[in-house]
Amino acid sequence: MKLMRIIWHGHSAFELQDSLTTLIDPFILGNVMCDVELDDLKPDVIAVTHGHSDHLGDTITLAQQTGCKVVAVNEIAKYLQSKGVDALGANIGGSIEIGNVRYTLVPATHSNGIDEAGFGWDAGSPAGWVISDTVVAYHAGDTGLFSDMALVHEMYKPKAVMLPIGGRFTMDINQALIAVKMLKPQLVLPMHYNTFDVIKADVGKFQRMVEEQTDAEVVIMQPGDFIDI
């Protein structure tokens, strides 16, 4: 049976290898946790959750180097198109199909924007991605806790979820625990923590709380680690 391989490259950057290779939020250069260089990455698709520099990251450089497609909320897609990137836009609730993979935008509660040389670009709504291939995975992006996470479970039933736990700019471990209870996944992959001092989190405590209070397994990854699901 073919499996989806999920690789963590630190912070919120994940590589999903299935029928296509999808890179989510490729913050590579400047990411002290990252295990790879730009030249190591050969994505078919880049999925961007929002425009902040630690998520949009190196999307433009990678897309120009590899010729891959980029999927993003419509305003970010238009910005990327202005840079010569093959970007496809959608909006919350909409899907983009590339090959056998369906990329669906779902809500996130966060801010958004693109800062370029002091000029602020409108980046539309922040989002999470539900990626449906051999299995279904959910990358929440940067987000606070919101009750419609229950709808992500009801509609898509993701097997694996990638959730921020660092607090300050996103959910902390206590809020992320409630998110897991709503999402009901088999696997939880913590992200967006310990990259910077202001988002330090006790990931071991998060793992214990989730596994004591839900049926989900928390996989604590180091940059470069992978899991096949």
From Swiss-Prot:
SUPFAM superfamilies: Metallo-hydrolase/oxidoreductase. SMART domains: Lactamase_B. Keywords: Hydrolase. Coiled coil: none annotated. The keyword Cytoplasm does not apply. Gene3D superfamilies: Ribonuclease Z/Hydroxyacylglutathione hydrolase-like. GO terms for molecular function: hydrolase activity. Belongs to the UPF0173 family. PANTHER family: UPF0173 METAL-DEPENDENT HYDROLASE MJ1163, UPF0173 METAL-DEPENDENT HYDROLASE MJ1163-RELATED. This is UPF0173 metal-dependent hydrolase UNCMA_04270. It comes from Methanocella arvoryzae (strain DSM 22066 / NBRC 105507 / MRE50).
